[in-house]
Amino acid sequence: MTNIHPTAIIEPGAKIGKNVVIEPYVVIKSTVTLCDDVVVKSYAYIDGYTTVGRGTTIWPSAMIGNKPQDLKYQGEKTYVTIGEKCEIREFAIITSSTFEGTTVSIGNNCLIMPWAHVAHNCVIGSHVVLSNHAQLAGHVVVEDYAIIGGMVGVHQFVRIGAHAMVGALSGVRRDIPPYTIGTGNPYQLGGINKVGLQRRQVPFETRLALIKVFKKVYRSEDSFSEALLEAQEEYGHIPEVQNFIHFCQNPSKRGIERGATKDAFQEESVDKEGALIES
């Protein structure tokens, strides 16, 4: 049963699904769609052509679907789509897109923490975490299972690969390859996200191959492109390695991040459970 508090403002035309809860002082504009089992907590504001997927919770004072912070926007019809079972926490801002017919999209099972900002034309995959005050500029792409730490700033048009983990307070100006971990401003890669991949039950052999490929590519005396081709020949049969190589071979206009710390090249050993540990 849908439960709408009498102080909430729901404009005529808004589409409200089954078992939706809308708390006091919420504002829902006329072109919004809330799917079944959505919860919108007090003072949240949802505008524009926004669709909120089933089971998602919008926390107090979040603002979704409002006019993009882009001077090029001239009132075109644009969209926001949020997937299922997401958590959009307090004071998060997800603006609408720029250019007719384009969409800001967020996948399923994402956690957007307080004060995070998702700008126009961003595309976020599923199972992504944006930590407190993470700021995504326009046209940023964040792939599945990536984690972006607190107070990170991401330059427009940057891509962040799947399963990457971006450390807090980082400034990200170039594409971050999938499966990597790093931090800093300027940003430096720290190698493969070994702990994250192990937690997600990526096979040991795959994790080890990714580590070897990262080292081959990032400390090779050959050119970056040549090192990628060599890695392709040796490890390209592994899907995750293929994904890493393809990502690096097809950068955005920002280019691939090339900086890496010395720790990224430490030798690896294996503990008795088969987990990778640093020597």
Curated annotation (Swiss-Prot):
Pfam family, one: Hexapep
Record region (Disordered): 258-279
Associated pathway: Glycolipid biosynthesis; lipid IV(A) biosynthesis; lipid IV(A) from (3R)-3-hydroxytetradecanoyl-[acyl-carrier-protein] and UDP-N-acetyl-alpha-D-glucosamine: step 1/6
Name of the featured protein: Acyl-[acyl-carrier-protein]--UDP-N-acetylglucosamine O-acyltransferase
Keyword Lipoprotein: no
Function summary: Involved in the biosynthesis of lipid A, a phosphorylated glycolipid that anchors the lipopolysaccharide to the outer membrane of the cell.
GO CC terms in record: cytoplasm; membrane
Coiled-coil positions: none
HAMAP family registered for this protein in UniProt: LpxA
Localisation per UniProt entry: Cytoplasm
Keywords on record: Acyltransferase, Cytoplasm, Lipid A biosynthesis, Lipid biosynthesis, Lipid metabolism, Repeat, Transferase
The species this protein was found in: Chlamydia felis (strain Fe/C-56) (Chlamydophila felis)
GO MF annotations in UniProt: acyl-[acyl-carrier-protein]-UDP-N-acetylglucosamine O-acyltransferase activity
A GO BP annotation: lipid A biosynthetic process
Stored InterPro entries: Acetyltransf_C, Acetyltransf_C_sf, Hexapep, Hexapep_transf_CS, Lipid_A_LpxA, Trimer_LpxA-like_sf
Gene: lpxA
Quaternary structure and partners: Homotrimer.
EC number annotated for this UniProt entry: 2.3.1.129
Catalysed reactions listed for this entry: a (3R)-hydroxyacyl-[ACP] + UDP-N-acetyl-alpha-D-glucosamine = a UDP-3-O-[(3R)-3-hydroxyacyl]-N-acetyl-alpha-D-glucosamine + holo-[ACP]
Protein family: Belongs to the transferase hexapeptide repeat family. LpxA subfamily.
